[in-house]
């Protein structure tokens, strides 16, 4: 009897005390957090020797601040969500674990074909030189939302080019009471750096670009920047577009604006705001010189202060997150993109796409997706460009003054990056 008891105790100790713990900080709340918790639960059930503890920190700002504070105090999780510019900043402290040795491990690694199955833009966003520091997680692309009922009633086709967008915006804008202020706007945009960057990329320009020495240089003082700023000024001066800093899904649902560009992550809000009022749809962003668009979203990084067994366990979970079935499950249940091409062949994705014809439309742009620069000062540079954009369209400064100041400020931050 004593021998049996000791055997049971040994089994229990292995079950409850022998599992390797992986602490995972994230910023996924609401239904997205519930989906993530289900993925974590499934992983833990299928990996009895590993326990992943998912810890919701709060929004992205809260997560970023906690990571920076944790880096200073030496109190970091095993893995965390992180934007590429966060990773770039943390790399300066040499606390982010390179993943190549885990990827190439004969027992727990992945093949070259499996890694190349991850969409190229997402792979590139996780790689510095030849070193992989992250795996992609919650990714979204920009798409054009439109009021299908209104466009159909007006006999307007969905714009496929910038010129068609201008034509449609003008044709759809209505001043019903003739007071000089439109009651319905054909197009709307947010006065954010994201809006400016989307159109700058479509025009073929960049905020920064790589120089001959492999370092980023300012590219904001360009003809493309001037054309994009002029484009938005024309929209506002012609009163065929509505602009505000906040999200546009509510006024879209009210029928006040009929087209706008935002990420696919906003779909649920559009569905809620427009339900029972009109039919909506989405389409790839219009072509200007290109259809290149930035993608949004975070990756998962591992910290080097973890124990070796924790790192290997963490890699198992990271590998699980980007497996075709799991990334497809994540995408179908959250509205984000699957990160691997083979995920589109999974049963869960095929069934979802069959019942939801909108699901695969954003993927028409996946090969045109462009990543943000991997700069630790990218947030600061974005703030500079946001100021330039807002000051100009609000008439605070003329175009040349706005651009020259932005160029000067961006160059200062790039000096800081490479000092």
Locations of regions flagged by a protein language model:
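Extracytoplasmic/periplasmic solute-binding protein
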Residues: 124-137, 142, 166-216, 257
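Short, well-ordered beta-strand elements
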Residues: 20-29, 50-55, 79, 317
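Long, aromatic- and glycine/proline-rich binding clefts that accommodate carbohydrate-like moieties
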Residues: 116-117, 280-283, 332-387, 391, ...
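Extracytoplasmic "Venus flytrap"/periplasmic binding protein-like
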Residues: 38, 42-118, 149-160, 258-259, ...
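Hinge/lid segment of periplasmic solute-binding proteins
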Residues: 84-141, 166, 199-201, 275, ...
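Glycine-centered hinge/linker elements that transmit conformational signals in sensory
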Residues: 168-170, 213-243
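Short, polar/charged alpha-helical segment
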Residues: 29-51, 385, 403
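A bilobed periplasmic-binding-protein/Venus flytrap-type ligand-binding module shared by bacterial periplasmic
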Residues: 145-148, 296-309
